[in-house]
Amino acid sequence: MKKIIAILLAVLFVTALAACGSKTAETAPAATQAPAAEQKQETYTSSQGTVDGFDPNQKTEFAMNTSEEVRTFNIGEVDPSLFEAPILVTSFGQSADTSMMDAIMKRSGVKDYAFNALAKDTDIKNYKTVIIVCGASSKGLGAAGISEADETARAEKIMAAINETNPAVIMCHLGGSMRRGVLSDKLTDMVLEVAKYMVVVEDANFDGKFTTVAQEKNIPLTYLYAIKDGMDVFSALFNK
């Protein structure tokens, strides 16, 4: 009889422990860290909207001319007299890089310029210099409420207006390799057809694209090690 009672007590004890463990598992707070794939999606903005042609995780080794010690590097010589006020800063691709360009202009002390990321073709006639910041962002396009097709059409209309009124055009590519891709490159190539100067954060040149264009089209090019290095470049260009 004592053995039976002992066995029953042991069974009850084990059952109680199992129930307690199950309750703890049910009430334990969920982990706050998302899976790696979800984290990458939140922190990575596609360089070209919904169809990605550049893998940000694929590292490409290439020799850079800029560094921590050498902040800028020039190919060719820019003529500041070509770039007169009034100046327009706009975007092809609606990336946050355009707002960074606005900050550069302000901190460089440039006075007579307007910032309008969504400028229209009808605005172009009012400016002697147009700075176009190239680099598409799905997040930026979504925030602006426009599609890739809409942005491409806007860019094409602006380019038609530029060909009519002939302002001096500066192509800026400030987002580095993350702003390379099918749509980003398509928008950039539009601007390179008429650009008189290029300013590029150098790690976007992983395939030699911008160096090749500069040499083939004889367009002055300044490489930046980081976006902030653009302040000295644009201060020298416009505060003459």
Where are these regions (language model features)?
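Structural recognition of alpha->loop->beta junctions
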Residues: 181-212
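Short, charged N-terminal beta->alpha structural module
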Residues: 80-108
